[in-house]
Amino acid sequence: MTTSHRPQLEARSGAKAAAYTPTGIEHARLLPGHTTLKYRKFKEEENLRANCAQEDRSNDKSLEEAVMNEEKQDVVGSGNLQETRSEKDQKDSLQELLVTQKNKVEDKAELEGNEQLKGGNSSRRSWRKGTAFGRHKVTKETNIKEHATKKSASGYINDMTKSEYHQEFLHKHVR
């Protein structure tokens, strides 16, 4: 494997001259790593930390319970407020539902109006099924105008530009 993909840390200028000054670039693989050691932690310290964490959690739970008790008292005292809030919430949600339904109907109407996004007629043949020379009949007329007005009756065309398929293609997609 070549080393040409690696950075050039020192220019190769033959023998190290007196004017040689090393660059400040250091390769990442040459830098020292893992210079510190992990020491074992004493189990006593870990137990103290775990106990402190459990006490904090229990304090948080007691605070949450106090807040819940206050809310229950507020709910008992203000039953009518809760009912009006729920009614307002229901009205808001109904309005949002109506707006989203209206938007869906508008989007559907736009999609139906867009002719390019329509599926089209399923009876149309795929463009992949057509061939350039294979299924087209030869016209014996030399006049192209006559060929355009009159359909050929027998044989195959060896010139793609005079084929009926090519004329239809030009009419559909180019003109």
From Swiss-Prot:
Primary localisation category: nucleus
Subcellular location: Nucleus
Coiled coil: 85-110
GO CC terms, sorted: catalytic step 2 spliceosome; nucleus; Prp19 complex; U2-type spliceosomal complex
Record's keyword terms, sorted: Coiled coil, mRNA processing, mRNA splicing, Nucleus, Spliceosome
Gene Ontology biological-process annotations: mRNA cis splicing, via spliceosome; mRNA splicing, via spliceosome
Region described as Disordered: spans on this chain: 1-20, 53-159
Matching InterPro entries: Cwf_Cwc_15 (IPR006973)
Coiled coil is among the record's keywords: yes
Record note on quaternary structure: Belongs to the CWC complex (or CEF1-associated complex), a spliceosome sub-complex reminiscent of a late-stage spliceosome composed of the U2, U5 and U6 snRNAs and at least BUD13, BRR2, CDC40, CEF1, CLF1, CUS1, CWC2, CWC15, CWC21, CWC22, CWC23, CWC24, CWC25, CWC27, ECM2, HSH155, IST3, ISY1, LEA1, MSL1, NTC20, PRP8, PRP9, PRP11, PRP19, PRP21, PRP22, PRP45, PRP46, SLU7, SMB1, SMD1, SMD2, SMD3, SMX2, SMX3, SNT309, SNU114, SPP2, SYF1, SYF2, RSE1 and YJU2.
Family: Belongs to the CWC15 family.
Protein name, as recorded: Pre-mRNA-splicing factor CWC15
